[in-house]
Amino acid sequence: APNTNFVSSACNTQKIPSGNPFFNNLGAMLADLKQNTAFSGYDYKTSRAGSGGAPTAYGRAICKSSISQSDCTACLSNLVGRIWGICSNAIGARVQLTDCFIQYEQHSF
């Protein structure tokens, strides 16, 4: 199993307003990261265009090269499930667990 211990985070102080359509793009983009990073060289960037004037969600996920593909996916799944709590609906975040990392923003990086 992957090591999902929390290492560090950097959270934007600006919050996504409740009910904002950006949540939808962000959710879709995080699901994309979770599903594809293990099969994309363990370092994968993607984006989801916004609907209804919502900003595009940009993201990147990285897994440690020493873990299996299934552990990479499991680590990112764990992190996606925790990122809202760690960065409480921030418009941008970087969170590192021992075996994986996710960054998301409203701008390309």
Curated annotation (Swiss-Prot):
Residues noted as binding alpha-D-mannopyranose in the record, renumbered to the chain: N12, R94, E105
Record has Transferase as a keyword: no
Q: Please state every residue range assigned to the domain named Gnk2-homologous.
A: 4-109
Q: Which InterPro entries match?
A: Cell2Cell_Antifungal (IPR051378), GNK2 (IPR002902), GNK2_sf (IPR038408)
Molecular-function annotations in GO: D-mannose binding
Signal peptide boundaries: none
Provide the alphabetized UniProt keywords. Answer: Antibiotic, Antimicrobial, Disulfide bond, Fungicide, Lectin, Mannose-binding, Plant defense
One family name in Pfam for this protein = Stress-antifung
Cysteine pairs forming cystine bridges in this chain are C11-C87, C63-C72, C75-C100
Give the domain of life. Answer: Eukaryota
What GO biological process terms are annotated to this protein in UniProt? Answer: defense response to bacterium; defense response to fungus; killing of cells of another organism
Outline what the protein does: Exerts antifungal activity through its carbohydrate-binding specificity.
Q: What is this protein called?
A: Antifungal protein ginkbilobin-like protein
Source organism of this protein record: Picea abies
